[in-house]
């Protein structure tokens, strides 16, 4: 059985708006196991990004406990949290945040500088990661010479740089056109299927969410619904519609011709 990578218990987060307290998260309980691909959905202001920031040790909970890879980060001081962020987490954002004066490989190398002393080893690993995300031959291109989809692939490779316990993706397809959205979500799903990469993704996109195996709906700072995603069918190599065998590369069942990822509304209001 997979071990828990993330355990959250009775988490709350309160901000002060002037003198008025605003509850962003209320009594959140969540466990994510090693190798899971989980989507967090919800309307603007529901608490999605706040939850991701707390998980990512960018913000601290007001009350409750957060265990990351067995380590309690809830009360950890900042001088220790930066090592947790560097060693245990990979971050992917809606904006790619690539340094324009560095090429693709150098951008991927940056997070490794505190962990891998050899420049040659960093260069080799960065090149390997860029190949994994489909950018072989583009290593020496600077961001301005890459398409938006390619820049996000570089950001994904950078997130994998230190072999993190978990990837946190905040609207990773938000700045992309339809074609690139589909390609990027397929890259993430492929990493999860083939490498067992644990991913938590915040998204508004129904099709992107259905590439995960578990979808959570956040409303007014609480997890109110949970639903199984179609990605789980691929892990089981079984079509959710007719039960026929499917391969990892399939987007449509070869037997019943039904799509393996849907784009319709997941959580009805």
What is each stretch, according to the model?
Residues 3, 234, 248:
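Flanking scaffold residues of small Cys/His-coordinated metal-binding clusters
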Residues 4-6, 11-218:
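ABC family nucleotide-binding domain
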Residues 240-246:
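Short Cys/His-rich zinc-binding micro-motifs
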Residues 246-249, 254:
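Short, charged/small-residue-rich alpha-helical element at the C-terminal edge
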Residues 258-267:
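Short Cys/His-rich micro-motifs in 6-15 aa windows
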């Amino acid at each position: 059985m997979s071990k828990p990578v993330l355990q959250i218990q009775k988490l709350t987060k309160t901000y002060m708006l002037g003198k008025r307290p605003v509850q962003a998260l209320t009594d959140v309980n969540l466990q994510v196991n090693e190798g899971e691909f989980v989507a967090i959905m919800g309307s603007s202001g529901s608490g999605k990004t706040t939850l991701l920031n707390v998980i990512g040790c960018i913000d601290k909970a007001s009350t409750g406990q957060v265990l990351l890879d067995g380590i309690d980060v809830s009360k950890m001081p900042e001088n220790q949290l930066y090592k947790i962020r560097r060693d245990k987490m990979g971050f992917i954002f809606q904006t790619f945040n690539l340094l324009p004066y560095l090429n693709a490989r150098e951008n991927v190398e940056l997070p490794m500088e505190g962990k891998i002393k050899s420049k040659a080893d960093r260069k080799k690993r960065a090149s390997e990661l860029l190949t994994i995300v489909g950018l072989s031959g583009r290593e020496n291109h600077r961001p301005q010479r890459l398409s938006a989809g390619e820049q996000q692939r570089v950001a994904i490779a950078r997130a994998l740089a230190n072999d993190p316990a978990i990837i946190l993706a905040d609207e990773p397809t938000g700045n992309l056109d339809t074609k690139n959205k589909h390609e990027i979500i397929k890259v993430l799903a492929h990493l999860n299927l083939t490498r067992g990469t644990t991913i938590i993704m915040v998204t508004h996109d129904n099709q992107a969410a259905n590439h995960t195996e578990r979808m959570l709906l956040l409303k007014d700072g609480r997890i109110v619904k949970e639903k199984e995603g179609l990605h789980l069918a691929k892990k089981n190599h079984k079509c959710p519609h007719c039960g026929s065998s499917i391969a990892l590369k399939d987007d449509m069942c070869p037997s019943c011709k039904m799509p393996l990822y849907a784009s319709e509304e997941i959580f009805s209001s």
